[in-house]
């Protein structure tokens, strides 16, 4: 045998000690290159919207309805109906959404991939997706997994007698796990020590991004749990859960304490108390939980399972391992006498009985109705009946005083429950889809909802090229500076989040509460700029014929374009910034202030802005912002350098403006940052602001933040800066800046995409 044959082959590509092993805090630029075309197997010209429009949705729903009662021996349906399993699948696909950063949710079909496919809260959902495969296989790319998971939940409800509010397609699949979502920093499943141990804030030791305050440490926890402070932006109380522990906080079976966790986690998913009660009660009208035996009978999750299991996990050695022997959550609860039929049985049982604490066969805390007969059907043996049971979190709806009032109203008014659940379910499953312009299909509801951030439909002729040129001249002659115009346009457009497709310049909500008062937008300067632009708008619209108008939303973006063209001209470059009119102005009545408040940037490195102190360094928060703006590393780099040259910053400090000719679109930021004649030193132990002095004379040249200096410190970013700092780079710099700028301005223009 040759020496090569004897030698163990341990140098496969990607193996060995990695850069992240050596430097775990290294900046995560890879967050800006995920979901590229290299991971997508579909043809480059594939258009999912067109494919979905060709889909026979009624035929898909018919096939799904047939599947509901087509019980398979390898995974038998509880009560002969897969509906409850598919409701849980859809709920858990959508329920990872959190309003804080818009990440999570159903929009990209991420339940197929790690870590979600292996979360403890998603046990057995691998089987649900395998049950769906024949239907996905039949319709191919006309319906994404992301859409199919949600549609299946709707059909499940409808086949059990519930009238849903509607369904919209349009969720495009991704083909690899999300890298940007911070799920927490615990190292064990169901851990919660970090998200609560550090108060309201946490830091991701693995180099990911988290925006969280430094404050709120170690408060005393009261009986109602109000002293618990879940770190932002997390929406679950333990690693691997969707929301809360159904046994109660950390397994403590206290309904009142559990109510605090429910309220906090559902609020972070943008749900109010009524929506929360409706969702829990509506969901628990159907099906059951599974805890037939001890958890040590359950094998590894899908990502840790053996190859021969073919992506299925949690192999169960208890009894038959399925059907009546299923172990999922460890709880063994069936809520109603009709678990495959819509009704008000959940609330009827909740208030009819007094409840005693007991344990499931798996040893989990749950509740059984005191002095109750056996009225609940068995999921797999029609000859057996069971006593009514509830979860600790179910009892929260009765014993929390606010939830109790809502619950009693729903008990007495089943029609109100049905309407509230239908609307809350639609919101749950569509919250991360963005505006209605992205909705596809014949079942899109006609009603416009404020949480969709509605914008009026275009109702007037648009400005033409001649109008645009004239308006640019008026804007530049208005007395507003280049930096003021660019700052305002950036502030308007950069609220966009690629995560949940919210924000952006369309709607001109920058002139409305709460955006007009955000510190990052410099309210006094903003009011001045808006007043001037409103005057130009009024004058222009007042002399047009045929109903032609320009919206303030368009004029804000056009002002930024005019200013950039002027700044490029000052640098000796002629450039035309792309501009597509058609934005409309939203009203204050169309703006949910509390919901829009979640879009406020706590950090915007492009404007050198930090609202507070965060454990994540400023440069990591820049990556977070760039990722939400769907920018690549080169786009982020050229945008930041250009904005610094244009003197765009929040507040009075001019950190990072490394140029002696501000408001000129030059590559000075890069040239001066890379100048070895400058020596940098921190101004304080916090190391958040630095001064750059001439190495020979000691003369102060510049001041900069961590965000500025990372472009010279980080090897990859420095390599990008070197491109734009080169002698032959000015033209390329302007061209690339304009392209990246135009991309940001149009991120929310789904109607023209």
Swiss-Prot record:
Residues given in the record as heme b binding sites: 284
Top-level taxonomic group: Bacteria
Catalytic reaction annotation: H2O2 + AH2 = A + 2 H2O; 2 H2O2 = O2 + 2 H2O
UniProt-listed Enzyme Commission number(s): 1.11.1.21
Pfam families assigned: peroxidase (PF00141)
Covalent cross-link site, Tryptophyl-tyrosyl-methioninium (Tyr-Met) (with W-91): 243-269
Residues flagged as site, Transition state stabilizer: 88
Keywords assigned: Heme, Hydrogen peroxide, Iron, Metal-binding, Oxidoreductase, Peroxidase
PROSITE patterns: PEROXIDASE_1, PEROXIDASE_2, PEROXIDASE_4
Top-tier EC class: oxidoreductase
Annotated cofactor note: Binds 1 heme b (iron(II)-protoporphyrin IX) group per dimer.
Gene Ontology biological process terms, A to Z: cellular response to hydrogen peroxide; hydrogen peroxide catabolic process
List of catalytic residues: 92 (proton acceptor)
Posttranslational mods: Formation of the three residue Trp-Tyr-Met cross-link is important for the catalase, but not the peroxidase activity of the enzyme.
Matching InterPro entries: Catalase_peroxidase, Haem_peroxidase, Haem_peroxidase_sf, Peroxidases_AS, Peroxidases_heam-ligand_BS
Cofactor: heme b
GO cellular component, one term: cytosol
Tryptophyl-tyrosyl-methioninium (Trp-Tyr) (with M-269), cross-linked positions: 91-243
GO molecular function terms attached to this record: catalase activity; heme binding; metal ion binding
Record text on subunit structure and interactions: Homodimer or homotetramer.
NCBIfam families the UniProt entry points to: cat_per_HPI (TIGR00198), PRK15061.1 (NF011635)
Protein family: Belongs to the peroxidase family. Peroxidase/catalase subfamily.
Listed name of the protein: Catalase-peroxidase
Source species of the chain: Paraburkholderia xenovorans (strain LB400)
Taxonomic lineage from the root: Bacteria, Pseudomonadati, Pseudomonadota, Betaproteobacteria, Burkholderiales
